[in-house]
């Protein structure tokens, strides 16, 4: 699933034309869902009405082909409940949820936060577990309490950077909790360890390659997946960087499905920093691999 970027015009308005172009590229590549309003989506800079516009537009564009998921990253429980309500009104299929923002909630507070929001909606929820960047970890004991209390908590975006955590989660929760890798540079390793999916970043610029890796890995064609992944890794490393938004938007420009515009306080890359990123992108494009017919992988069997 792509965690898509938010497209802006030169005068800092939503660029819905380029947004639609990118979503169609994702659908053409065979993605299994669209995630809006994450870190890559510059959610912290978006107005509430803009988030709602993006959800409605995405729902219109995908036309039922794949689920549309909106991220919730709020400072208060009341605001999170309100965001969930609006997601339903706007036609979203599910929610991705970070722990409370700014305030570092303890385990009990985090559990109550998730439980209260989950109980306020019928939408399925994917917990975004990223203690590295956000400072709060949802532990296995916390997951056990949440899964017992909330049937609509169904998945985790696993971004702890601990590959063994995938095995531990599978051993403890089995199919009750779907696991999606949330770190581009650990994606194939995570799939080999049993992750169910991949919430991806560079997919915004390279949708076909990303989906090919996923489909090949799931079909047991690991050597083919690994060959593409090795080519992809220098590009994937652009996602594990504080300038990931700017990096990936540069890549989207290079592949013709995005613009470089970001929203302040972010600024476009300049100088040597920009040139280094462009060199990585250009090297990747020069050696871009031919892909197998990954869309018909199972009909070939």
Give residue ranges: language-model regions.
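C-terminal alpha-helical cap/extension of soluble enzyme domains
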Residues: 1-7, 29-31, 195, 199-301
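Active-site beta->alpha loop and helix N-cap motifs at the rims of alpha/beta catalytic domains
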Residues: 2, 6-135, 145, 291-292
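A general structural signal for well-ordered alpha-helical segments in protein cores
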Residues: 19, 51, 55, 80, ...
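Short secondary-structure transition/capping segments
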Residues: 46-49, 82, 107-110, 138-140, ...
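Short, amphipathic alpha-helical "lid/cap" segments that border enzyme active or binding sites
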Residues: 16, 20-23, 140, 274-281
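Catalytic alpha/beta core domains of metabolic enzymes, predominantly
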Residues: 119-120, 133-242
């Amino acid at each position: 699933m792509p965690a898509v970027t938010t497209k802006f015009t030169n005068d800092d308005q939503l660029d819905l034309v380029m947004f639609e172009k990118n979503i169609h590229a994702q659908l053409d590549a065979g993605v299994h869902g669209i995630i809006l309003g994450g870190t890559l989506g510059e959610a912290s800079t978006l107005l509430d009405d803009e988030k709602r516009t993006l959800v409605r537009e995405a729902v219109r564009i995908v036309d039922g082909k794949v689920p549309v998921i909106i991220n919730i990253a709020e400072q208060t429980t009341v605001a999170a409940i309100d965001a969930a309500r609006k997601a339903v009104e706007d036609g979203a299929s599910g929610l991705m949820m970070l722990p409370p923002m700014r305030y570092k909630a303890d385990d009990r507070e985090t559990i109550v936060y998730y439980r209260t929001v989950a109980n306020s909606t019928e939408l399925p929820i994917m917990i975004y577990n990223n203690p590295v960047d956000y400072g709060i970890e949802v532990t296995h004991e916390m997951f056990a309490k949440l899964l017992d209390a909330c049937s609509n908590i169904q998945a985790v975006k696993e971004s702890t950077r601990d590959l063994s955590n995938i095995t531990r989660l599978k051993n403890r929760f089995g199919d009750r909790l779907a696991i999606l890798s949330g770190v581009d540079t650990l994606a194939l390793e995570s799939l080999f360890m049993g992750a169910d999916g991949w919430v991806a970043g560079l997919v915004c610029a390279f949708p076909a390659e990303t989906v090919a890796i996923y489909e090949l890995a799931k079909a047991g064609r690991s050597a083919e997946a690994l060959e593409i992944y090795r080519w992809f890794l220098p590009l994937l490393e652009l996602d594990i960087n504080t300038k990931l938004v700017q990096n990936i938007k540069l890549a989207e420009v290079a592949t013709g499905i995005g613009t470089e515009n970001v929203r302040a306080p972010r600024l476009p890359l300049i100088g040597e920093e920009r040139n280094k990123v462009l060199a990585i992108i250009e090297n990747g494009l020069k050696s871009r691999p031919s892909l197998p017919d990954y869309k018909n992988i199972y009909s070939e069997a």
